[in-house]
Amino acid sequence: MNLEKNREVMIENQLRPNKITNNDVLQVFMSTSKEKFISEDKKNICYSDQDISIKDQRGYLKNLHLAQILHFAEIKNNEKVLHIGGLTGYLSVLIAKLCNKIYVTDNDQEFVENIINNFKNNEVTNGKVIKEEFSEGLKGEEPYDLIIIDCPQYNFNLDLLSQVNVGGRIIYIEKINEELSKAYKMIKYQDNFSKVFLFDVFSNFYLTKQEERFNF
C-alpha cells in the first residue's frame, strides 16, 4: 500500500475540488502522515472519504471537513491557538504547522500522552498539551486568537468567548441530531459576537453526551 500516493490522491480528489486551494493548508496535509496517528487496522482507510473512529464516540472527521476547518480558520503564523479535544494529535499537528503557538487539551490521559508523543515525532516545538475538561477551554494562557473544537458537540459553552481576543475566532461544530451537525465560525467584537454557518457535517461523533433536560 502506497500511503504517500494515497495522500496525494486525497488532496487532489477530496480537497482541491471542494475549494481547498490555500497552498499552506494543502502543504500541511501533504507533509503530515495521518497513518501514524491511528491504529494499524485503520491505516488502509485513513485517506479515504470517511470518518475514522478512534475511541468511544470520538474520532477524526473526514479529511475534507478537517481541511474546511483550517480553511475557514484562516490561521496566521503569528497567532496563538487553543485546540480543544486533540485526540491523538493529527489535527493539532496540522494547526501547529500554521500558527505561532498551540495549546491542546483533552480530558483523556491516554490521548494527552499520544499528543505529546506525536508532537515529538513530528518535531512540533511550539505546542503544549494539557489534560482539561472540554467545556473549560484553557484558563491561564488566554487570550487566544483562535479556538478550534473539531468534534461535534451538543452543548457549546459561550463563556469560551471570554478566552479569545477582540477579533478572535472560534470554530466549532454544533450537533443537531444523531446524524447531522453544523459547523460555525464565531468572531468576537468589543461588546458582542457574530456567528456564521460554514458547512454541514454528517457524523455520529460527539464530544460529550447530551445533557438531559427535564420539563416540569
Segments predicted by a language model, with ranges:
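Class I SAM-dependent transferase core
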Residues: 1-94, 98, 110-125, 189-210
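Conserved nucleotide-cofactor-binding alpha/beta core module
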Residues: 74-194
